[in-house]
Amino acid sequence: MYRIVRKEALRPTVTLYEIEAPLIAKKAQPGQFIILRTDENGERIPITINAYDPEKGTVTIIVQTVGATTVKLSHMKEGDCLADFVGPLGKPTETEGKKKVCVVGGGVGCAIAYPVLKKFHDDGAEVHAVVGFKNKDLVILEDDFKKSSDKLVVCTDDGSYGRKGLVTEALKELIDAGNQYDEVFAIGPMVMMKFVSKTTEPYGIPTTVSMSPIMIDGTGMCGGCRLSVGGEMKFACVDGPDFDGHKVDWDLAVKRNQMYKDFEAHKYEETCNLFKKEAE
């Protein structure tokens, strides 16, 4: 049940997992997510789907090792089974009817941006992509983005690969060059999505952001993933994960997302130390 059939290290801290989940694979669409638990005592974490194969009955996710649960996941092997793998959750990304779009991805968020970009491309849109990473060693899926985009700009914070600078700078240049986008779709760190939205707002370009705040049950019951969008309370798990970036209360969203930062750091260190002791 929920067996890991393939595990592939894309980068030192970024890993691809292909999970046996036939029912989810049959229903999944770009933009949707799953909630997984590594073991009976583990926490539930939301991860947006990277790919799905109804014929094989598998769902692929790409995960960066940044917290306690992702550390546990990184120590699992092919053949191991997850305790829970629930989905598909959330509403699929709307891609039809667009003539020209720009997809902006940041870090491991590019794993989420890619299936959306491909769907825009398959639906006939001209697709531009701007993807950003901290450095060359963290660049992922570049070849996939090239295949499904008409224009690709790769940015790194330190200039070790592609263009040096932020994705917002590259996006603004594309807009100022006369590209008239029907929509900009952004997925990545919350701060990045905030400033992508602020970049496009003066131009009046509709901007969609994919939100992955703290979630527990994924059905709207716990209220942990609530956001303020256009002055109304929304739940990312059932109303999203896609929202109008110009209407999100970003200050509140960022504040809520950092509520458990100290606790998460403690659990991360505790989990890492546990695995170190087991290895000794």
Segments from the language model and where they lie:
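Structural signal for conserved beta-strand scaffold positions within catalytic alpha/beta enzyme cores
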Residues: 6, 51, 154-156, 209, ...
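Short, Lys/Arg- and Gly-enriched loop/turn segments at beta-strand edges
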Residues: 42-51, 89-99, 237
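Local cysteine-cluster metal-coordination motifs and their immediate loop/turn environment
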Residues: 112, 190-191, 212-242, 270-275
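Short Fe-S-cluster ligation motifs
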Residues: 235-239, 243-280
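FNR/FR-type flavoprotein reductase catalytic core
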Residues: 68-216
